[in-house]
Amino acid sequence: MVITLVGEKLAKPGLEFIYYGPGEPCKTCRLARVCIGNLEPGRRYKIVRVRNIEHPCPLHEGKVRVVEVVEPAIEVLMEPRYAIVGSKIKLSFVECNDDDKAELVRPEGLFEGDLVKILEIVDDVECGGRKYKLVKVMREKG
């Protein structure tokens, strides 16, 4: 669980977002350490709890709220031989040039080489004549 700040209009349990890095006003903000200091650029986060604390923010149209976030499970295509529920593997993206499947091939929030735990096999997917497994994974830290 990570504590961070999000714009009050976005502060809703269940909302997912990608953190892309600090905005210009963040570089001099006194709350930057708690707001962006706990987030990794390029990672996906899901709000699990909104606390009743708010702060002024020049970036988020007035105010930000304190929230608790986690990295959610993410769906990704994988070679069938690696798709074993419960196993932990180093993520290797598959080759698939179908634009409709781009978000499953290289989903935002995951990077090549991440250590992930396979939680569930969701579906079988074909791309370019090859068969892959669509799996739900959770990134393992450290």
Swiss-Prot record:
InterPro entries, alphabetized: UPF0179
Domain of life: Archaea
NCBIfam families, A to Z: PRK01177.1
PANTHER family (alphabetical): UPF0179 PROTEIN MJ1627
Family affiliation: Belongs to the UPF0179 family.
Protein name as annotated: UPF0179 protein PH1477
